[in-house]
Swiss-Prot record:
The gene is A1BG. The keyword Secreted applies. This is Alpha-1B-glycoprotein. Glycosylated. The keyword Lipid biosynthesis does not apply. It comes from Equus asinus. Its main location: secreted. Plasma.
Amino acid sequence: AVVFDPQPALWAEADTQLEP
């Protein structure tokens, strides 16, 4: 997840949890 983009980072983290 990117630090300078909090919102997209949330989706990125969720995506990794859904598809490890």
